[in-house]
């Protein structure tokens, strides 16, 4: 299953993190890989900041397929949804530590939240453009460029998510993802250190594929 209904955080304690987009008291929770953070239909009364690890947000479609709508990396926040209940599932990809902010703190920090929400909205709009107009090579190139920028802009990229996650995010099959990665490698645009680590060999050439 993509989410276990009874999954709970492995440990929770009240403390303060280091630098964070929002100040004030928060809970800190650590989730094991694959653990559900919240489910579709759960009360929407918190927002979350990734301290370590990675999170996927997804929805299960009526035919049983999974559509991943976003990934969240250290320093990024998620959980912003309209309405009183969540419309998506959130799940830890790797062992993940989160700062969890309650509704009261969210209201007190509305200006900070607005900036974060707008950043998330811009990323979501860009993602819609990618999957709506680009071919498989362009989608994966855009995904790698975006992820690289979110990890600091260096030439080595660590993929916390699986190729199935990437396929479900980009609207592709896992076979297509593997073929495109191989094609980019053969063109010397990327090099694979292992299944989850990619060296960006020609960043400008990779970026040009996104246009």
From Swiss-Prot:
The keyword Repressor applies. One of its GO terms (cellular component) is cytosol. FixK is a protein that regulates nitrogen fixation genes both positively and negatively. FixK appears to repress its own expression and that of nifA. FixK may bind DNA at the FNR consensus binding site. It holds the Pfam family HTH_Crp_2. GO terms for biological process: nitrogen fixation. PROSITE patterns: CNMP_BINDING_3, HTH_CRP_1, HTH_CRP_2. Residues 134-204 form the HTH crp-type domain. Keywords: Activator, DNA-binding, Nitrogen fixation, Plasmid, Repressor, Transcription, Transcription regulation. One of its GO terms (molecular function) is DNA-binding transcription factor activity. This is Nitrogen fixation regulation protein FixK. PANTHER family: CRP FAMILY TRANSCRIPTIONAL REGULATORY PROTEIN, FUMARATE AND NITRATE REDUCTION REGULATORY PROTEIN. Residues 163-182 bind DNA. InterPro entries: cNMP-bd_dom, cNMP-bd_dom_sf, Env_Response_Regulators, HTH_CRP, RmlC-like_jellyroll, Tscrpt_reg_HTH_Crp-type_CS, WH-like_DNA-bd_sf, WH_DNA-bd_sf. The keyword Metal-binding does not apply. SUPFAM superfamilies: cAMP-binding domain-like (SSF51206), Winged helix' DNA-binding domain (SSF46785).
């Amino acid at each position: 299953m993509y989410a276990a209904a009874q999954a709970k955080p492995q440990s929770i304690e009240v403390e303060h993190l280091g630098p964070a987009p929002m100040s004030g008291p928060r809970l800190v929770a650590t989730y094991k890989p694959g653990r559900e953070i919240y489910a579709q239909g759960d009360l929407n009364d918190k927002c979350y900041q990734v301290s370590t690890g990675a999170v996927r947000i997804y929805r299960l479609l009526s035919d049983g397929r999974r559509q991943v709508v976003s990934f969240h990396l250290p320093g990024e926040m998620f959980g912003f949804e309209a309405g009183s209940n969540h419309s998506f599932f959130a799940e830890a990809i790797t062992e993940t530590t989160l700062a969890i902010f309650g509704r009261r703190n969210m209201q007190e920090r509305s200006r900070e939240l607005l900036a974060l929400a707008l950043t998330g909205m811009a990323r979501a709009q860009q993602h819609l453009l990618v999957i709506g107009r680009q071919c498989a090579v362009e989608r994966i190139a855009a995904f790698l460029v975006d992820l690289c920028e979110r990890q600091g802009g260096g030439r080595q990229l660590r993929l916390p998510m699986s190729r199935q996650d990437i396929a479900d995010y980009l609207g592709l099959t896992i076979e297509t993802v593997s073929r495109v990665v191989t094609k980019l490698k053969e063109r010397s645009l990327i090099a694979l250190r292992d299944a989850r680590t990619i060296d960006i060999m020609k960043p400008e050439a990779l970026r040009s594929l996104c246009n």
